Each structure stands twice: as C-alpha cells, then as structure tokens.
Swiss-Prot record:
Catalytic activity: N-acetyl-L-glutamate 5-semialdehyde + phosphate + NADP(+) = N-acetyl-L-glutamyl 5-phosphate + NADPH + H(+)
HAMAP family on file: ArgC_type1 (MF_00150)
Name of the protein this chain belongs to: N-acetyl-gamma-glutamyl-phosphate reductase
GO cellular component: cytoplasm
NCBIfam families in UniProt: argC
Main function: Catalyzes the NADPH-dependent reduction of N-acetyl-5-glutamyl phosphate to yield N-acetyl-L-glutamate 5-semialdehyde.
PROSITE patterns: ARGC
Main location per the UniProt record: cytoplasm
Keyword Zinc among UniProt keywords: no
Domain of life: Bacteria
Active site residues of this protein: C147
Alphabetic keyword roster: Amino-acid biosynthesis, Arginine biosynthesis, Cytoplasm, NADP, Oxidoreductase
Amino acid sequence: MHISIVGITGYTGLELLRLALNHPHVTVSSIHATKEVGVQISDIFPHLKGIFDKEIQVFDSEFIMTHSDLVFFATPSGVAKDLSKNFVKNNFPVIDLSGDHRLSPDVYLKWYKKSPCTVDIQKRFTYGLSEVMNISHRNRFIANPGCYATATELALYPIISNHLIRVDSIIVDAKSGLTGAGKKLNQSSHYVNVNNNYVTYKLNKHQHIPEIVQTLQFFNKSLQNIQFSTSLIPVNRGIVATIYTRLENGVKINQIESTYKDVYKNKPFIRIKDGLPQLNEVIGTNYTDIGFVYNETTGVLTISSVIDNLIKGAAGQAIQNMNLMFNFDETDGLILAPLYI
C-alpha cells in the first residue's frame, strides 16, 4: 500500500517515516510540510541520505488521494482539523496523530484554546487506542491517542473497566523525555533549563487530562476526574507514568495481577512485568511495559507504565492502527528490539 505523511519535519513525522520505511507492505508515496517545500528530506536530515531522498511537497489533498491509500497527519494541534476535511468528505482513510479529533468540540476548545472541528466530523473518528478499541477495516478515520494518554490509559483500563479500584483515588505522576515537548523551542524545553534538572509543566492543565478522563469514563461511568501531573526529565525519549490508587472494598491483590494478565494475554505489545518496568527496556519499541506494587501498610496500589513516547505514544501506535485497518498482521513493521543502551 502507499501512504502520505503530512508534517514530515517534526519528531513524530520523522519517526513515522522511519517505521514506514521498514514496513513490509508500505511505500511512502509523498511527504508534506509547510517549510522546505521542494527540498530533499535528506538534505535537511542527512541521516536519511541514500535511504530516502524524496522532496518535500506542498500539501495537496487531491494529489494525496490519487497517489496514496492512506494519509497520516503528524502536525501540531489545530492543523489536521482543517487539512483533513476533504479526505473525510471523500471517505479517504486518515490517521491523525494530533489532538484535533480526540475530543468533543466543546472540550477541545476549552483545553486546546483553538477552534474545533465540527461535531459531525469528530464523531466519524475512532479513538485509536489499539489494544482496547478493536480497530479494524471498518474504521476509516483514526484519532491516534496522545503519548501521556496512551501510557496512562493502558495502565488503568483493565482495573477500571473491571471495577477493581476506587475511581475517586487516582493520582497520576507522568514524566516525559524532551521529544514529548515537540521541536518548537520554549522555556520548559530549553537545554539549559532541562539539563540536570526536573521541570514540572502544565500542572492540572495538560490537554491529555480530558482525553484520559473521556476514555476511561467510557469503561466506568463512575469516574469523574483524575489528579494528573506532567514533568520533563533530561532524556530524549520515553514516558514513565506512575499511578497511585486504592483497591475497591473486598478486592485482593491477586485479582489485580490476574486481571492484567487476562485482559492483555493476546496483546503482543503489552508486557506485564513481575516487578516494576524500566524506561530503557521499551525505548525504540512499540511496547508498553506495566508493573505494580501493593503497599499493605498504606493500602495504596502503585502502577508503573513505560513507553517510548515517539513510538507507542505516537508513530508506532499509528502504524499499529494502520495494520489493523488494512488487515495486515498487527505486528508488521513493529517488531523492534529495545535500544536499551
């Protein structure tokens, strides 16, 4: 199949290209951006020289629909909702890696502070949490989940949907590598401010909060909200979500373990660890590693979920959704050993 990537010069666009080039069934037909149009991508990013040398093209939806079978949007928020309209009108498959189609329009406006897509268009998009939402060939439009949301939702879904924890007790402390802040320079991601430092940002205001709540409420209506903090740590890649919660009355810790293993037993990209996971065990992969510890003294269940924010938190999950949409094996192009060192 042939694909096009819009937003090729960002971290996510480049990672999407890297994964697509190694996919057994994919040819990258065109790449698009607002800058460097007409320039070979390998002249901007020399690591691609001799591997992929296509020119960056101006965005043209008609050209993409003529030459490709699917378009990926790896664009900043506020872009895809406008550029995708013609694709939706023509029922042409779209995977949007931005937040533009994840939330209802009123919630999007509140948290993103940008004009939303219409209700009709938003409802045509399926939220692409691959292991949970049963993505298939019936889905034409995918709203790929956010990175923090992916790590948090996959950690909580089994025990929230089975009503094993108190939903009024959830605290999430999430930490991300610097690529999670995007390429645009700002004070929170400036090298001098982040190196040898720990920076908390968007406390109680991160745009993935309503996404997480919306998704988890679908499986447990009792959930009203969560306490969620986000911080940057001085690594390039990765997310660690540490979650604190309490068990429902009568629930035993062995039920937690058996539920995780049962829910995810046929999910190739989720690994339930005997102990707590480490970030370097998932970097460079599409895996989500989940571990937990129960403190009998305090009655607190601590869950740790780790992912590579650029792969499972973005480009890898997008490829996984593509595989499911086009009836490929779910793991095609995604069997990647961790970088580890």
